[in-house]
């Protein structure tokens, strides 16, 4: 079993303490899902749908889905995959707004296991620590690679960055289109969902909140 990085442990414990961690049944790092077992159950589902698993086009589908779940679209369930974080001392005393916008995200609705996709914007006002800009994108990507609801995803990103940078002054917004809304039920192909999570001065000062949202 791999040892989690200090940053991964900090973030994981913070989410647990705030009650916004993804609802795990067991500790994932000790019980990594078995691709072969998942493949077997996918095969059973396909068989119950009367699909011919001897067909060349379908025969490898159970293995493909199992691999995709564990190694790709749900890889964020495993904190061993938490990105390596570059933290920098704020020796330049930077205290202005830093924003990364147009962060493309793809996640999976935990209710129907259908994709939702959109963009995120993340801002923070540094105190003693700065973070490498690409690491913000990687944090968004890590938490997106789970069965999710958009509201919790937004909060998880916020808390992760607050903990790593030791500041409350963080804001996260996500605007996404959900395939579970587009492809089933109401079948609305136009609507998008906007979620906000604000901390520190982003919540208490309207001018800073307005600045954060101006290009979103």
UniProtKB/Swiss-Prot annotation:
Entry binding sites for Zn(2+): 109, 112, 180
Keyword Transmembrane found: no
Gene Ontology biological-process entries: one-carbon metabolic process; tetrahydrobiopterin biosynthetic process; tetrahydrofolate biosynthetic process
Enzyme class: hydrolase
Gene Ontology CC terms, in alphabetical order: cytoplasm
Pathway stated in the Swiss-Prot or TrEMBL entry: Cofactor biosynthesis; 7,8-dihydroneopterin triphosphate biosynthesis; 7,8-dihydroneopterin triphosphate from GTP: step 1/1
Pfam families documented for this protein: GTP_cyclohydroI (PF01227)
Keywords, alphabetical: GTP-binding, Hydrolase, Metal-binding, Nucleotide-binding, One-carbon metabolism, Zinc
InterPro entries according to UniProt: GTP-CH-I_C/QueF (IPR043133), GTP-CH-I_N (IPR043134), GTP_CycHdrlase_I (IPR001474), GTP_CycHdrlase_I_CS (IPR018234), GTP_CycHdrlase_I_dom (IPR020602)
TM region(s), chain numbering: none
EC number per UniProt: 3.5.4.16
UniProt KW Lipid metabolism keyword: no
GO molecular function: GTP binding; GTP cyclohydrolase I activity; zinc ion binding
Catalytic activity: GTP + H2O = 7,8-dihydroneopterin 3'-triphosphate + formate + H(+)
Entry superkingdom: Bacteria
Family membership noted in the UniProt record: Belongs to the GTP cyclohydrolase I family.
Subunit structure: Toroid-shaped homodecamer, composed of two pentamers of five dimers.
Name this polypeptide is given: GTP cyclohydrolase 1
Gene expressing this chain: folE
């Amino acid at each position: 079993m791999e040892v989690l990085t200090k940053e991964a442990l900090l973030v994981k414990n913070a989410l647990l303490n705030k009650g916004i961690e993804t609802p795990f049944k067991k500790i994932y790092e000790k019980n990594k899902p078995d691709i072969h077992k998942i493949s077997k159950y996918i095969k059973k589902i396909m068989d119950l749908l009367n699909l011919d698993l001897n067909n060349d086009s379908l025969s490898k589908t159970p293995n493909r889905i199992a691999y995709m779940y564990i190694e790709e679209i749900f890889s964020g369930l495993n904190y061993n995959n938490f990105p390596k974080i570059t933290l920098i001392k704020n020796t330049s005393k930077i205290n202005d707004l830093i924003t990364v916008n147009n962060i493309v995200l793809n996640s999976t609705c935990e209710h129907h296991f259908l994709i939702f996709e959109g963009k995120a914007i993340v801002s923070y006002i540094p105190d003693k620590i700065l973070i490498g800009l690409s690491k913000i994108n990687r944090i968004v990507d890590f938490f997106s690679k789970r069965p999710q609801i958009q509201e919790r995803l937004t909060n998880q990103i916020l808390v992760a960055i607050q903990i790593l940078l030791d500041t409350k002054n963080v804001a996260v917004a996500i605007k996404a289109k959900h395939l579970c809304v587009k492809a089933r039920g109401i079948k609305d192909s136009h609507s998008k969902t906007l979620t906000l999570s604000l901390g520190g001065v982003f919540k208490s000062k309207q001018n800073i909140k307005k600045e954060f949202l101006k290009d979103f």
